[in-house]
Structures are given as C-alpha cells and as structure tokens.
Regions:
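A short tyrosine-centered beta-strand micro-motif
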Residues: 102-110
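Alpha-helical interaction segments
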Residues: 14-15, 95-96, 169, 177
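Primarily secretory-pathway and cell-envelope proteins
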Residues: 25-82, 112-216
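Tryptophan-paired
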Residues: 72-103
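Sec-dependent bacterial lipoprotein signal peptides
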Residues: 1-24
Length: 216
C-alpha cells in the first residue's frame, strides 16, 4: 500500500506534467493587442482565464496568483506557476488574464506588490516544499476555477477582506461592469463570447493568515 507521502510526491509529478504538456502560460502585455489566438489555443488544449481581485483597487503595482493542482484528501500542491493579474504596464481598470492549459486549478496565494512591501494572502500550509515553493502542500486552495479548451472564462472578482496579521475572508463577486466593458477595447482578441464561470471558495482554507513581507 502506498504511503501518503508517496501519493503526494506522485501527485506533484502528475500535476507538473499536466501543465508542461497542456500548453503555455501567458500574461497581458499592453503592446500585444492581437493575442491570444483562441482557435490555436483550442487546438493546443488551452483556454483563457479572465479575473479581477479587490487588490486591483488597493494601490498594488502588481497582483499575482500562485496556482496549485488538487491532490488526495482535497489538498492542493503548488506547481510552480504564478500568473500576473495586474502588471505595471497593464491598461487601467482592465481585468487580468492568463493563458492556461485546460483543467482544474486552485489559487493558494495572492500577492500585492506595492510601495513599502508585498502584501501576501496565503492558504494554510500543511507541508513545506522546496525553497521556491514548488511542492508545497496546502490544506485547501483559497479559490478554485476550471478552464476548457478555447474558452474565455470570466472567473469573477476575488474579494479579500482583512488586514495583515489578522484572519482574512475570501469571497467571489462579479467583475465590475466598467472593467469588463474595457476588456475588448484593451485586448481585441478577448472580444469574443465569455463563459461566465465564477471561482468557487472551498469550505476549508477559505480563511488563512495575511502577512506583509518587507521589501529587500
């Protein structure tokens, strides 16, 4: 009988392989208004995540999300993939997007980079991974989402409430209408039909500790 640690290690390898074989990751570039090619993405088995967070409105210069894959017992493993939902060169008041291989994902960490330090919202860590975080096991992701081949998925707006050093809450709301309306203007390739599929908040891991990391 396989031990739990062996099953987790095997799950990490499978999760990493699924990302490596399934396609590519992408983030917005303010100069790239023609990509992505949805037909090509569908052929590659990839889709597009469109998302917003409450951090977009809190003076963050960058907002990133650390992705994880589900494993045994409802836990999630950091697979070493981070997507940028807001970048310094992104158009104002526009949701972020990422090109991802089709599949199920969890977000285990949201990071706000702003003057004075980084504000980090992280799910509960069960077992630490490597120095760069790959392989870290979390009790449950903060939110989950699903993408199908060739889909533009409107996954909603993740609302994070609570101050650093306190317990914080996670909820999912609609992306503000004004932001959605700006999306096809900023990025013509995303003018097609979106699949509205809001992220889900798991029953476990929906509240964790927030921390402020000082800038080095």
């Amino acid at each position: 009988m396989q031990r739990p640690a062996a099953r987790v290690t095997k799950a990490v390898s499978a999760a990493l392989a699924s990302l490596a074989l399934g396609g590519c990751l992408g983030t917005f570039s303010s100069a790239d208004r023609a990509a992505p090619d949805l037909t090509r993405l569908a052929e590659q088995g990839s889709g597009v995540l469109v998302a917003h967070t409450s951090l977009h409105d809190e003076g963050c210069r960058e907002v990133t999300a650390t992705l994880a894959k589900p494993v045994v017992s409802g836990r999630s493993i950091d697979v070493g993939r981070t997507v940028t939902l807001k970048g310094r060169s992104h158009p104002a008041a526009t949701p972020g997007y990422a090109v991802l291989p089709a599949g199920e994902y969890g977000v285990v960490r949201f990071t706000c980079d702003r003057p004075g330090g980084a504000r980090v919202y992280s799910a509960e860590v069960v077992e630490p991974g490597s120095g760069d975080g790959i392989g870290t096991v979390y009790a449950a992701p903060l939110v989950t989402f699903r993408i199908g081949p060739g889909e533009i998925v409107d996954a909603g707006s993740v609302q994070l409430t609570g101050a650093p050093g306190e317990r914080f809450g996670v909820a999912v709301a609609r992306i503000p209408d004004a932001w959605i309306q700006n999306l096809p203007t900023a990025y013509a390739a995303l003018a097609g039909t979106r699949v509205v599929r809001p992220m889900a908040v798991p029953s476990r891991g929906a509240r964790a500790e927030a921390a402020t990391a000082p800038r080095l």
